[in-house]
């Protein structure tokens, strides 16, 4: 749902949100193109809010999916340089010309136990890995990853099978959980750094979170942890970028506040830093 700038009534996202009933120059009468890698992209026009920290806004990231896909989101630690032209497949206009739509609008036939067609999913739920059963696609999107359909990943030709894509997803999800957890795990889920929580940010003085005209390393790191959570893809939108960004963020927090992590964590972080590859500079 959304609310117009000049209004107060929540509006449902419907056909006319993306399609122009009066016609357009784009495919399927879309309001904007789907292949552009900037803010003129149909999906990114909305999914681009509060993708970087701003001293005028204390609510953190809002809908940062577009800039994250393009490698342009988050707080950039001192010395961190990312070559945004070195893009992974998901954001590569040549390898994936339909960008968001390839994953989020794949069609799917759901068969009954006997193999007959029970439901045809048109992709307009926008689930990249939908929950499916013989009744159709579960709109709660709350099922376990083991029963989600990763058919879009194999149909695109990017992954050998849905099972292979699922395994990749789980590996990326675990890696992001390790990196964000090294910075902060909100154990009680209250959205605040407090007693009982874990991670480097729990060891930083509270004065570093003043929310004034200066974005401290601690505030930037907190933003990046929130970025991964709010993005909602568990890191899949841009694994190389988020991996590099979080690794650099951890280094920045450790250096700024003189902190350390247990040896096992340090060894894993060192392996990640060594494998970041081209497109990244940590100075």
Predicted segments, located by residue:
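C-type cytochrome heme-c attachment and multiheme electron-transfer modules
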Residues: 1-283
């Amino acid at each position: 749902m959304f609310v117009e700038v000049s209004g107060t009534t929540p509006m449902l996202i419907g056909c006319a949100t993306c399609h122009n009933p009066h016609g357009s120059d784009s495919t399927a009468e879309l309001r904007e193109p789907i292949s552009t890698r900037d803010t003129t992209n149909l999906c990114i026009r909305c999914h681009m809010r509060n993708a970087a920290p701003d001293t005028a806004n204390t609510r953190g990231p809002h809908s940062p999916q577009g800039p994250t896909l393009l490698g342009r989101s988050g707080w950039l630690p001192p010395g961190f340089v990312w070559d945004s032209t070195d893009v992974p497949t998901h954001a590569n206009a040549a390898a994936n010309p339909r960008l968001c739509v390839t994953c989020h609008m794949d069609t799917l036939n759901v068969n009954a136990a006997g193999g007959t067609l029970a439901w045809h999913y048109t992709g307009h739920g926008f689930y990249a890995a939908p929950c499916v059963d013989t009744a159709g696609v579960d709109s709660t999107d709350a099922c376990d990853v083991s029963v989600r359909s990763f058919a879009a990943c194999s149909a695109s030709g990017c992954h050998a099978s849905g099972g292979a894509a699922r395994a990749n997803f789980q590996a990326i999800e675990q890696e992001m959980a390790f990196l964000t957890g090294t910075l902060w795990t909100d154990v009680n889920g209250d959205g605040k750094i407090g007693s009982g929580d874990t991670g480097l940010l729990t060891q930083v003085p509270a004065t570093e979170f003043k929310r004034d005209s200066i974005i401290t390393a601690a505030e930037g790191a907190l933003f990046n942890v929130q970025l991964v959570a709010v993005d909602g893809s568990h890191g899949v939108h841009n694994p190389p970028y988020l991996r590099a960004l979080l690794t650099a963020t951890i280094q920045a927090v450790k250096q700024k506040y003189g902190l350390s992590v247990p040896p096992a964590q340090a060894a894993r972080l060192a392996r990640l830093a060594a494998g970041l590859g081209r497109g990244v500079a940590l100075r």
